[in-house]
């Protein structure tokens, strides 16, 4: 069904030491605000639109950008967090507070590619034939009982972890409440998000 997506591991060897943020933007204003936030906390070593090709069955696409980043040493030290927790909290904060911006991939030397489309169309749209990976995960439809939107397609990712699954997480609300006690925020309208965190 609709809601296809892929995650490729090993696709950015030239930036293997940097976090690769893949971001959906609904508006230019959201992009500008998100970039200001990224620049406050990270050194951006490269940024670009993620290459795509027009596809007749992929529509209503957001702006899709990628940023290769490293935490600013002063910000990381002031946070008193380890690097991975610093990045995870930043991603969750942006996704929770910045309307119109969604960081859907944030790992090192890997990236998620997803859309409102069938998997074969999503692969063509993102020109995945141009990427070389040592491992891929993929999924073919939106999670059960969730609304269809670009960010809601599998796989779900945080840092280097990606999750795809079939079925429903029956204890979603209990899991959501538990992880929210640790500062994680569930904003993606799906039970799968809990597993990723």
Language-model-detected regions and their locations in the chain:
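Conserved short alpha-helical segments that host acidic/polar catalytic motifs at enzyme active sites
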Residues: 1-197
């Amino acid at each position: 069904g609709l809601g296809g997506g892929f995650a490729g591991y090993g696709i950015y060897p030239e930036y293997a030491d940097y976090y690769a943020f893949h971001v959906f933007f609904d508006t230019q204003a959201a992009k500008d605000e998100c970039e200001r936030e990224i620049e406050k906390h990270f050194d951006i070593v490269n940024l670009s639109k993620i290459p795509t090709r027009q596809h007749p069955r992929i529509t209503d696409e957001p702006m899709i950008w990628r940023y290769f980043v490293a935490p600013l040493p002063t910000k990381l030290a002031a946070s008193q967090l380890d690097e991975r927790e610093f990045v995870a909290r930043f991603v969750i904060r942006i996704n929770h507070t910045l309307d119109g911006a969604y960081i859907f991939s944030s790992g090192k030397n890997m990236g998620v590619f997803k859309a409102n489309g069938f998997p074969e169309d999503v692969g063509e749209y993102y020109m995945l034939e141009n990427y070389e990976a040592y491992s891929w995960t993929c999924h073919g439809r939106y999670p059960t009982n969730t609304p269809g939107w670009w960010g809601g397609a599998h796989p779900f990712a945080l840092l280097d972890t990606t999750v795809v699954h079939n079925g429903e997480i029956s204890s979603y609300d209990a899991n959501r409440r538990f992880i929210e006690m640790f500062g994680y925020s569930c904003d993606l309208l799906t039970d799968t998000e809990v597993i990723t965190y």
